[in-house]
């Protein structure tokens, strides 16, 4: 991985292909240049407060944007001493996660962890759990926050960057506050924007250095805003 990282950082014409998750269509290979990877890295580091002392556990596929670009590659560029990449196992996850500060889970993985025997009495204090790839329900967010975790609901796409809009949720009171403001049939996207954005006929458009193409990208996602400029997701166009 160290040699792989140096190629990304030092070679102008080098790039890597990331497999899209397939949530918005057929999975495809997305090519990212070194400059694009740097942009994704910078946002991931700042948005998640990653430092050289962070300890990252990756349990998602590293050929996908979520598995590689959200935490794993940023942690390597920071020189983190503890970075482990493992195949996801819901039963083992709770036993191991206490030694880490950051991880990323899909909603399906979060549900699987919730169903394990150990979840009822687990303590996730001091752990930032990034949740995304698909919308994360309030029920799931509340379950993990009630165990002490900071849940960072994250929205991104393979084409526009892994971490584009998100929100940190660390208390039941915050959840109740947000639930009261969530429009019917919508789920939370976030209130922290790491891109330029606009809404045209209810569809979200974004633009940033993390996008694989210049200019405005039509996401195909139908969204809404509340008075506090928090964004919510309804579904695909």
Give the positions of each predicted feature:
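Conserved AMP-binding/adenylation subdomain of ANL enzymes
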Residues: 39-55, 63-102
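Short beta-strand->loop structural element characteristic of the AMP-binding/adenylate-forming
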Residues: 1-6, 28-31, 80-88
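Conserved AMP-binding A3 loop
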Residues: 15-42
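Active-site glycine-centered loops adjacent to acidic/histidine catalytic or metal-binding residues
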Residues: 23, 133, 156, 221, ...
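Conserved ATP-binding/catalytic segment of the ANL
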Residues: 187, 198-199, 203-237
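Gly/Ser/Thr-rich phosphate-binding loop
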Residues: 102-105, 114-182
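Short Gly/Pro-enriched turn/cap motifs at secondary-structure boundaries
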Residues: 184-191
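Conserved pre-ATP/AMP-binding loop-to-beta segment of ANL
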Residues: 2-19, 49-55
């Amino acid at each position: 991985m160290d040699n792989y990282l140096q190629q990304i950082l030092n070679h102008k014409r080098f790039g890597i292909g990331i497999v899209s998750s397939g949530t918005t269509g057929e999975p495809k290979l997305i090519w990212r240049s070194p400059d694009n990877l740097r942009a994704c890295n910078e946002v991931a580091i700042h948005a998640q407060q990653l430092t050289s002392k962070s300890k990252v556990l990756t349990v998602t596929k590293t050929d996908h944007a979520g598995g590689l670009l959200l935490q794993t590659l940023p942690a390597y560029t920071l020189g983190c001493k503890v970075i482990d990449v493992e195949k996801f196992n819901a039963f083992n996850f709770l036993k191991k996660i206490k030694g880490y500060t950051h991880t990323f889970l899909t909603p399906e993985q979060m549900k699987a962890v919730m169903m394990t025997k150990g979840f009822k009495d687990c303590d996730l204090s001091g752990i930032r759990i990034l949740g995304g790839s698909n919308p994360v329900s309030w029920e799931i967010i509340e379950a993990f926050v009630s165990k002490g975790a900071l849940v960072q609901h994250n929205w991104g796409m393979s084409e526009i960057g892994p971490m584009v809009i998100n929100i940190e949720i660390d208390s039941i009171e915050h959840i109740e506050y947000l639930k009261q403001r969530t429009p019917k049939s919508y789920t939370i996207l976030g209130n922290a924007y790491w891109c330029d954005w606009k809404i045209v006929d209810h569809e979200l458009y974004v633009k940033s250095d993390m996008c694989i193409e210049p200019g405005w990208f039509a996401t195909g996602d139908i969204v809404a805003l509340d008075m506090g400029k928090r964004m919510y997701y309804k579904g695909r166009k």
